[in-house]
């Protein structure tokens, strides 16, 4: 049980360093961009499959 507590304590320290260091803001911006890129690719794929007459699912 002490091992788990130590593991989560170390994870909390790493998360705090990343969060307070400004890295989290940059990572969130990149994640937002990637979300919209992959959303656009999903829509393009569905449209292309629908135009070819194939089933979407």
Curated annotation (Swiss-Prot):
The chain crosses the membrane at residues 4-24, 27-47. GO terms for cellular component: plasma membrane. It is a multi-pass membrane protein. It is found in: Cell membrane. It comes from the Bacteria. Belongs to the UPF0391 family. This is UPF0391 membrane protein HNE_2348. The lineage of its organism: Bacteria, Pseudomonadati, Pseudomonadota, Alphaproteobacteria, Hyphomonadales.
């Amino acid at each position: 049980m002490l091992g788990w507590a130590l593991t989560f304590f170390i994870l909390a320290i790493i998360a705090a360093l990343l969060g307070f260091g400004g890295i989290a803001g940059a990572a969130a911006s990149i994640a937002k961009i990637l979300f919209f890129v992959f959303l656009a690719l999903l829509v393009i794929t569905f449209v292309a499959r629908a135009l070819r007459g194939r089933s979407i699912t």
